[in-house]
Amino acid sequence: MPSVGRVVATLAVVAGITACQPHPVATAPLPVSPATSSAAAPTASALQMLLVITDDWDAVPGVMRRFERDGVRSVWRPVGSDIAVVVGGAGLGWGDGLHGTGSPNEPGPIKQEGDNRSPAGVFRLTSAFGYAPRDSMSWITMPYAQATDAYKCVDDAASIHYNQMLFRQPGSAVDWRSAEDMHRRDSLYRMGVVVEHNANGQRVGAGSCIFLHIWPGAAGNTSGCTAFSSDAMNALLAWLKPESLPILVQLPRSEYDRLRALWGLPAITHSDRP
C-alpha cells in the first residue's frame, strides 16, 4: 500500500490499510480465492517477525513473540519475552495478506468488514503513527505519521478511499459515511503500527484499518486490531526496522501447528502458548 502522501481531490492520501471501530458492513457477498502455491512461504523475505498465537478462532487473548534473523536462510531467534495481547472481540478470521486471499485451502472464518475479527495470516508492517510530532519520535525508524485531528482512516466500503489513511483538508468534501479518527480522545492510538491487510482496499468489504495499538487492558478487546501494553509498544517501535521487512503472523494454535513448516515459522514450545 502507498505510504507516501498524494493529493486526491482535496484529500491528502497517506496510506492504504485495513478498521478497529464499528463501521458499515458490505451488503454483497465477498469473492474469496484460496491462497495458491505462490503463498507457500509468505515469510521468505522478512528478517523481523511478530508471531501472535491465540487458543482458537474465537479466542480474544493471545501471546505475541518477537523473532529476528540475520538473513533469509538463517534460523529465527527469539527477541525479548512473551507479550500478552488481545484481538478482536469475535476472535480471528482469515485476512488478505502475503499468504494470499482468505483461507489457505482450509476451513475457518473469513475476515469481513464489521465482523469484530482480527485478520489471521501473514501481513507486512508498513509504518507507524502516533499523537506526538515526528521530530520527537526520532528513535522510531519506521515511516511515521503524526495523528492530528485531520488524520482519518476510511472504513466505509462504499467510498473510493476505502481502507486508506488520509489527512482531510478543512472544508473538503467526502464520499464516506464512516471513518476512524486517528487522533482519539483516549490513549489507544497514542502509538501504533499499520498492518497491511487488504492492501489499498482491493477487496471491498474485506476489512479496513487494521493496526497494532495500545490496549484498553488485558480484559478488553478490539474491533479487529491487535492491542497490547504501552511498554510493549515502546519496545516494539524501537525494535522494528523497515529494511528488515517486518511482518505480523497471526494464527490460532491449530493453524500454527499445521502451517509452521510450510510457512517457515519459528518453533515455539507449549509454555510459549496462550
Regions found by a protein language model. Give the residues of each.
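Short cysteine clusters
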Residues: 225
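Bacterial signal peptide processing site
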Residues: 21-23
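C-terminal motif of bacterial Sec signal peptides marking the signal peptidase cleavage site
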Residues: 17-19
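Cell wall/extracellular polymer interaction/catalysis modules
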Residues: 30-222, 232-274
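Bacterial N-terminal signal peptides that target proteins for export
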Residues: 1-9
